[in-house]
């Protein structure tokens, strides 16, 4: 990847986008602890970099995964208590070429 002729080093991340159901804030309560535990485990394994809900309106979430393939993000979604219990209308994974910060900085 080049920026004004200079070589940039990119780190591959995968973004997991969730679209949540109407009434998500209320409906998630019974599954929230399970979901957070599941996310913490992925973080502790070094797969999940950061995660959070999209606010105003609360209509989705974004989770950032590291790795050479979308495997960790896809596997996370398939096993997430929010997905399993119908709180997520849809999810998708997109590759992101991160240049700032780079892992070399």
Regions found by a protein language model. Give the residues of each.
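Conserved, structured core segments of small domains
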Residues: 1-105
């Amino acid at each position: 990847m080049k920026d004004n002729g200079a070589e940039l080093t990119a780190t591959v991340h995968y973004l997991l986008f969730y679209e949540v159901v109407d009434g998500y804030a209320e409906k998630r309560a019974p599954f929230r602890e399970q979901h957070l535990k599941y996310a913490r485990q992925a973080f502790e394994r070094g797969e999940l970099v950061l995660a959070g809900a999209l606010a105003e309106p609360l209509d989705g979430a974004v989770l950032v995964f590291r790795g050479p393939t979308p495997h960790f993000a896809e596997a996370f979604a398939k096993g997430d208590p929010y997905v399993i219990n119908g709180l997520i209308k849809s999810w998708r994974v997109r590759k992101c070429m991160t240049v700032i910060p780079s892992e070399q900085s």
